[in-house]
Amino acid sequence: MTNSFALALHGGAGTISPQSMTPEKEQEYRAALGQALAIGYAVLGRGGSALEAVELAVRSLEDCPLFNAGRGAVFTHEGHHEMDAAIMDGRIRAAGAVTGVRSVQNPIRAARLVMDKTEHVLLGYPGADALARQHGLPMQPPEYFFTQQRYDQLQEALAEGRMRLDHSEALETEAPLQEPAAFPNEDPKKKMGTVGAVALDVHGNLAAATSTGGMTNKQYSRIGDSPIIGAGTFADNRTCAISCTGHGEFFLRAVVAHDISCLMEYRGLSLSEACRIVVHDKLAPIGGEGGLVAVDAAGNVALPFNSEGMYRAYQTSADAAPFVAIYKE
């Protein structure tokens, strides 16, 4: 058992600046991040597991309509919601994930269910919802996930024949309105909407969890990096726990989360150096914008991003004061 414990979380990354939101909205984001941090950190403070801490922190963010996950999930091209989530236990490298769920209130709970109650790692679409329902997880009708802001974003995207990453400016396509391109060129002015958390508990165990609603106006059952173990989510007690946020296609191609772990394991790099290499030297040159939160086995925290901002927070037993930030410093 170690005396160290730490929790870090994020609520998305992208073109985020003081000019892009009102002071009131900024305070709402900071309060929501702080609340999720307090919930997860309280678990660690009483000797609870890293798994419980990251799950509860992510559930708090899923319940907040400000973030593109759970209740605040964006709309697909067809006007419904397809949510993804993943969780991983660094102690034994067990993992569970769901993709394309439409009814489960907290997708991260469904991901935990896959890990704990099945022999599988990734379940999707009606089958994943059915498993959640069978095990008594809270389910919600479509109107629970309706937010006016997200609906307005969908209407704008449909009218423009575009697809959006979270509640940002659109990704332009040359396809006709009735059939927008599945993977358009990236617009430099956007936000990537995902929530996630990583933790180290007093028992020396690491865990990671990630949840997202994906892209506004997405179709063809598009899946990003969030539910893919090793790309958007990863945890290994020997190295680190990682939760990513960004343009998922690039994070998938770069296998970001696992790459950071490998740099630490095979090259002996520190957490901060491994994160810097992947986020700034590997992702950025291929057009991958976004960031991540990470914690290592010693309780060191890293929150790198190559975008203009990232909703983020962390707290450690070594520095008990909570840290909450949005913009570049």
Report residues per predicted region:
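Alpha/propeptide regions of enzymes that mature by internal proteolysis
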Residues: 1-329
